[in-house]
């Protein structure tokens, strides 16, 4: 039992630690460098004792100082001499120096009261530099051996290197956005730049178009447009749907004509629908897809039709009741009283020379717009927009009708916002705001507008965005300022527009200085939307910004999803231009 208990590890369960000899912990578990260093010092002394006759007593005294250590290290074999291959002569000289250091440090060790027992084991005795270097070398070699023998020390750094590899070396799958099927099959997208707003589909990549790129019925290769056309315009005017029927009839034909239908925004569904439609699936499975296409087209056309009615009604209403304050939109250019007030001069236009011409052309354009709408996509209206460059023609009208409290109120962005609302659509809604209630944008912000309908005084136009305030530096006089206001219209129709441009929604009567540098919160985030396009010359590029005929469907502008409920076209561009100039003026 005795050998098993003390030295036979088969009988030791690890709990009876006191049964071992007192020197067990240091003898079997001595891995710390402090014990090794003291052991090395002692072994050097013991190894060199025979050759140190004159100073033998002092070394013995030094050995007594190491009493507790020498007891523990009786059985530890001293490998230091073998490891370092030190000759007897070197050891004797080193031991002599060590003896002197021991004498010097004896007083120091005795002075320390409680740490006296621990000091020999916690740190090596102060020896000369060579001895310490020797000991350090031995310790380093032993530590390296321990590192080789210790699996935990081995695996530790390896794990670190495995977990902390640079990302480039790791075999991670690249985080790429899942590529849409557009890379292989482009989806029918309403493209205003292509002829008649038809969809553009690169048929060179189609499996079922063996004769190369499809030609439109006009004989020109289908245009591919870049820019906004790449975006999915879900609220575009819906072109006619005959091509879908043709596709169903001529399924076996070589060139498949895709119906120019605007998709509803669901990319995968549209790809599947389009594949079904172009003959990748059998006819039985394609019928539901075709039905969905037709339903989409009917819905879109139905949405576009009321708007055209609004436009025609608006033209008639504006021309009939231009004298009335409500319908006249507050801008009667004196010479052309019969012209619908929609003829807004462009900012910085050449002059009033073209005022009458632009008004007349605009009136005829408004009447034609309903008929030309489906195929033109509002391009005719936008073109007519470029024909209205006069500023002075508007002055005579509202100067005699409206007075604005502030000379600044008629600044350009306000004018442009007026322009946004004079378009035929809003003209029908200006009388009172009945059809405006149907427009989602206004419905969303009704509370915000009613908030400010309290002050429907002539000063309300001052809510024009800070752009408005500083827009027309040359026009500071009261006669120009008073021209453009119908206070009711301003509160309802223009103020949400002012908010879109980044206007301070409230504080309408705050002085112009304050409005120029309004508190930054108003200008940041949802109130500080900056227009991407600042010039009315970019009409063709911004046509896709909004469907000109479908005013019932709002367009999301800006990060906050601010809805613009009047169609953009020319008027929105004027608004953008005015706001940009006003915002960036020093």
UniProtKB/Swiss-Prot annotation:
Organism: Pyricularia oryzae (strain 70-15 / ATCC MYA-4617 / FGSC 8958) (Rice blast fungus)
Residue ranges of domain YTH in the record: 435-576
Gene: YTH2
Region (Disordered): 98-128, 141-181, 301-464
MF (Gene Ontology): RNA binding
Compositional bias per record (Basic and acidic residues), positions renumbered to this chain: 441-458
Family named by the database record: Belongs to the YTHDF family. YTHDF1 subfamily.
Name the record gives this protein: YTH domain-containing family protein 2
Entry's transmembrane regions: none
Comp. bias (Basic residues): 398-418
Job description of the protein: Specifically recognizes and binds N6-methyladenosine (m6A)-containing mRNAs, and regulates their stability. M6A is a modification present at internal sites of mRNAs and some non-coding RNAs and plays a role in mRNA stability and processing. Plays a role in pathogenicity towards plant host.
Deletion phenotype: Does not seem to affect growth but produces fewer conidiophores, as well as fewer spores on each conidiophore. Displays milder disease lesions on rice leaves.
Gene3D superfamilies xrefs: ph1033 like domains
Coiled coil: none
Polar residues bias locations: 107-128, 169-181, 352-368, 421-436
Pfam families referenced in this protein's UniProt entry, alphabetically: YTH
